[in-house]
Amino acid sequence: MNDPIVAMSVALGGWQSKLQTASPGIIESFDRDAMTCSVQPAIKGQIRDETGAVQDVDLPMLVDCPVQFPSGGGCTLTFPVKKGDECLVVFSSRCIDSWWQSGGVQAQADLRMHDMSDGFALLGFRSQPRVIGNISSTAAQLRTDDGAAFVEVDSSTHAINATTSGAATVSAQGNITMSAPLVTINGDVKVNGRVDTTGDVKAGTISLMTHRTSGVTAGGGTSGVPVP
């Protein structure tokens, strides 16, 4: 005797198996000009062979997945996307082809729904073997995975810190202005250009503005060293 509940359950299960929502994936390649990537789904699918046995198989490569870089108001945070990076692919409920090609509000180029052809790649999700260490519990950081270089904003002290094991370069077409009660530089300073100051300059205990010189005599000779 046929059970309509069982039949409905089987039909619903078959429909659900084709419904794509989200899946972890591994970046295969990245097109930085189109801002899209190819992704290998990291969860295998299942098929039955001719004997009825279930086998795990790789799902098809997801191509032309738009990559999300956090952005808004004319500013964007970008980062390198490399082969092997892990990501989460979320699938649109409707076909994205027309929107992706032309932007704006578009008609559907195809009536497919929750399809593997309409994935967006979100980077940053990690499996346990690829987690990064030393996550700060007090500050927001822009950092390298190894932690050797970072810029952070501390939420409690409001301090901004920058650390790197390499070089640091600041370049500006306009002026650079620093305002603080005291600026401390630990290290030698080399200036390729003129130095103007509205206040005094001291070398050790010797003032540039008020120091006296020793061994002064009238005439065209050379005075002695400055007097502290």
List each language-model region with its residue ranges.
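Hydrophobic packing positions characteristic
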Residues: M1-A172
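Residue-level signal for pocket-adjacent positions within structured domains
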Residues: P60-L62, D196, G220
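Low-complexity, small-hydrophobic/phenylalanine-enriched stretches
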Residues: L142, V151-T164, A168-A172, I176-I185, ...
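Short, low-complexity, Pro/Ser/Thr/Gly-rich segments in the mature regions of secreted, periplasmic
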Residues: G221-V227
